[in-house]
């Protein structure tokens, strides 16, 4: 990790995407599954490592995160709007059996592997 200097407004905007949105996503995925799967044992028995790693942030302190969400709500709401737009776009492609478009999107998005790999490589230096 590298120290990045920026003004507080820029900080709050960027952090709403790379930190706060991750927590919202994790909490809401956990909520969605808990509401659907009334039998908690089913969640435990059926969930794989992907689900566990995706909801890891939902195990964070609600007392800490609720105020953070509200304190940065203007930026977080914008981030959520962008995220929901992307979810709706994917939903539409799934509904319309648009496999080619889904594959193109997923391949483009998959470059996050390289981006995060750079983070790991920079930490090793």
Go through each PLM region and give its residues.
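Long, positively charged, glycine-interspersed low-complexity recognition regions
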Residues: 114-125
């Amino acid at each position: 990790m590298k120290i990045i200097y920026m003004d507080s407004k820029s900080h709050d905007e960027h952090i709403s995407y790379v930190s706060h949105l991750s927590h919202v996503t994790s909490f809401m995925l956990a909520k969605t599954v808990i509401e659907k799967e009334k039998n908690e044992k089913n969640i435990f028995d059926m969930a794989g490592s992907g689900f566990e790693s995706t909801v890891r942030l939902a195990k964070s302190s609600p007392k800490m995160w609720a105020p953070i969400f509200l304190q940065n709500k203007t930026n977080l709401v914008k981030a959520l709007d962008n995220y929901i737009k992307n979810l709706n776009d994917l939903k539409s492609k799934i509904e319309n059996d648009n496999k080619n478009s889904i594959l193109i999107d997923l391949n483009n998005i998959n470059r996050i592997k390289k981006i995060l790999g750079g983070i790991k490589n920079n930490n090793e230096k």
